[in-house]
Amino acid sequence: MKKIRSILTLSLVMLTMVSMAQVNWVSIEEAQELIKKEPKKILIDVYTKWCGPCKMMTKFTFNDKWTSDYINENYYAVKWDAEGPDSCTFDNKLFTNPGHVAGKSGRNSTHQFTEAIAPVKGRIAYPTIVFIDENLNLITPVQGYQKPDQFEPMLKFIKEEMYKTSNWNDYMKTFKSDRSVTKG
């Protein structure tokens, strides 16, 4: 009985530790200040409140222990409401959402900052992960839901600056995962 109780207690502790995996989100303004002290790239999760795949990415990808640890160590992470009412300043430019309708359920007006950073071939989709370098230059937006094991090579490709010397397909041919937790 003691052995079963010990196993259950250990399992509960491990489950609690895994469920506590969490990305340290900051505002876009905070990220810009933090870069001045310790340069890192910025990762922006561009989401909407009505987007199902955005919610899945939050629940499964950003709460994955390996993923959240890697992001926290190597990036400043920003969670950005693509249709939100809040203004922001990025690279000394003010962005607003003049068309935002307070209290509206469902889709709302797209924020100017979203329009500046998230389009791929002129189209905005959610979720979009936007990567920005230490000098506040846009590296790339990546649209669509990413599972933790799909997100790992992307995080490393950007962090290791492989995008400067390799194309994505060539990188993926030789990519080896070093995830030490169960894929989610």
Regions found by a protein language model. Give the residues of each.
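Bacterial Sec-dependent N-terminal signal peptides
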Residues: 1-23
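N-terminal "domain-start" segment that seeds a small globular fold
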Residues: 19-34
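Short, flexible loop segments at the rims of nucleotide/cofactor-binding pockets, characterized by
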Residues: 21-22, 56, 105-107
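A mature extracytoplasmic/lumenal domain signature
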Residues: 47, 58, 81-84, 144-146
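Short active-site neighborhood of thiol/selenol oxidoreductases, capturing the structured segment around
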Residues: 38-55, 77
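Thioredoxin-like thiol-disulfide oxidoreductase module
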Residues: 28-32, 65-68, 72-128, 132-140, ...
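Non-globular targeting/processing and membrane-anchoring segments
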Residues: 23-24, 36, 40, 117, ...
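Periplasmic/extracellular electron-transfer cofactor-ligation site
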Residues: 49-63, 135
